[in-house]
Swiss-Prot record:
Record protein name field: Urease accessory protein UreG
The species this protein was found in: Rhizobium meliloti (strain 1021) (Ensifer meliloti)
Top-level division of the source organism's lineage: Bacteria
GO MF assignments: GTP binding; GTPase activity; nickel cation binding
Gene this protein is translated from: ureG
Keywords: Chaperone, Cytoplasm, GTP-binding, Nickel insertion, Nucleotide-binding
Role this protein plays: Facilitates the functional incorporation of the urease nickel metallocenter. This process requires GTP hydrolysis, probably effectuated by UreG.
Keyword field contains Nucleus: no
Entry's Gene Ontology BP terms: urea catabolic process
The UniProt record lists the keyword Lipid metabolism: no
Lineage of the organism: Bacteria, Pseudomonadati, Pseudomonadota, Alphaproteobacteria, Hyphomicrobiales
InterPro entries registered for this protein in UniProt: CobW/HypB/UreG_nucleotide-bd (IPR003495), P-loop_NTPase (IPR027417), UreG (IPR004400)
Length: 203
């Protein structure tokens, strides 16, 4: 599929500090042996996330592109995705065999969503540190993303978050849509996320 229709484009969104860059790093490392992978990161005025991924050695630097969105980062993934589409087109020209491109959004609120013109699949990342009530607060990221990742589960006892409550609320808010608890520090949950992307992305 990727060779015929271009690479599978996977949007990764979520609030600041939820673990988007850590997830992107882990997914790149889990998939790079089998697939040709690249990343586009979005930051408001810097290329900090792209530089972090290079430091983490997620991928060779020529496969990681940082775009500076200015203003509201959600605009660059939704209303006017041209800056990201251009970055993907440039990557595709340089690396014609691309199978997967991860698009990491700038940290934003629960209302941020990806334009269907930009992302084939979307992952929304929240952290238990943001409060156990986050899943039930809803918002497009919680309810409409293809996969919800509830990250930093290991910190739940320290922030007073009940994972059982979060699981119940996520199941209710998302109906049949899947969600995964994860701990990116230890890599817990990464295998399930890769499996989801492989199956639902047609890889």
């Amino acid at each position: 599929m990727p060779s015929k229709n271009g690479p599978l484009r996977i949007g990764i969104g979520g609030p600041v500090g939820s673990g988007k860059t850590a997830l992107t790093d882990k997914l790149c490392k889990a998939m790079r042996e089998k697939y040709s992978v690249a990343v586009v990161t979005n930051d408001i005025y810097t290329k900090e996330d792209a530089e972090a991924l290079v430091r983490m050695q997620a991928l060779p630097s020529e496969r990681i592109v940082g775009v500076e969105t200015g203003g509201c980062p959600h605009t660059a993934i939704r209303e006017d995705a041209s800056i990201n589409l251009q970055a993907i087109a440039d990557l595709n020209r340089r690396i014609p065999d691309l199978d997967v491109v991860f698009i990491e959004s700038g940290g934003d609120n629960l209302a941020a969503t990806f334009s269907p013109d930009l992302a084939d699949l979307t992952i929304y990342v929240i952290s238990v540190c943001q409060g156990e009530e986050i899943p039930r607060k809803g918002g497009p990221g919680i309810t409409r993303s293809d996969l919800l990742v509830i990250n930093k589960k290991d910190l739940a006892p320290y922030v007073g978050a009940d994972l059982g409550v979060m699981e119940r609320d996520a199941a209710r808010m998302r109906a049949e849509k899947p969600f995964v608890f994860s701990d990116m520090k230890r890599g817990d949950g990464v295998e399930r996320i890769v499996e989801f992307l492989t199956v639902h992305g047609g890889l």
